[in-house]
């Protein structure tokens, strides 16, 4: 049972999402509707994109805490270009390139300069946030064109164009990691770095690619953010890095690298977003959101740690069972046989 849970964390995350959807339905029947699903999905798109990028980095046994700042910086660039008269496609491409470049820089710091990921990205967190504030002068960017907002308008089955793009990206990333040698290189790099090198995996390049794609996903999240609310505050992206990491952990992505799946991270992002909608339904003040999300994450981390210890103990028992089995006892001869011998 323990091994099944460990190897199928996506199923447990899915069950948690379903329970969080069904249980509030007993309080309000209107909550059990397609409209609720589309609303939660629309709210979860930013976190889903960030969780997908964070998954790639965490699979390589690294962590990136700068994605919130990358999201804010890229959203600011998008707003500045649009207000300067550039077309939406040009502004979006430039925004994605900036995110890719920011992620690439993180990857270079970690893979080539050998700076620990948490230290490197803590530094770039402040760097990218500072660039964002220098560009805006601490002011909000408003007056964004209506065509940007159309990206988040319902298009088909109540899902926007960006929503469908996110679904396509999830499917593509799941296929890439599960079915291709390139995708399996991320797992190999995080599971055993030296072993992956001996197998011919270019581990430095894989880590740089992971950070670069993570930055690109953060840039796309910035585009989604700007299109959904129609303006860009000076604190855009603050705290999103922690939510992205939490979503991955909730979905079964190991902090030790080498295990997990994209679909688990997506379900973790959905779960965290759905908590907010349930709190609204229960009329709980919004300032409880982070507390409850943190409490849930802490519970999952404790459960994950205890589960890992139990599995390791069970594995050791199986490994040494044949050495611990006592030899069969020798039965004494019966008294009748003794008399015959006499």
Curated annotation (Swiss-Prot):
The chain crosses the membrane at residues 14-34, 39-59, 70-90, 93-113, 115-135, 155-175, 213-233, 252-272, 284-304. Residues 1-13, 60-69, 114, 176-212, 273-283 are periplasmic. One of its GO terms (molecular function) is transmembrane transporter activity. CDD domains: TM_PBP1_transp_AraH_like. It comes from the Bacteria. InterPro entries: ABC_transp_permease. Residues 35-38, 91-92, 136-154, 234-251, 305-342 are cytoplasmic. NCBIfam families: PRK15432.1 (NF011961). The complex is composed of two ATP-binding proteins (LsrA), two transmembrane proteins (LsrC and LsrD) and a solute-binding protein (LsrB). This is Autoinducer 2 import system permease protein LsrC. It comes from Escherichia coli O157:H7.
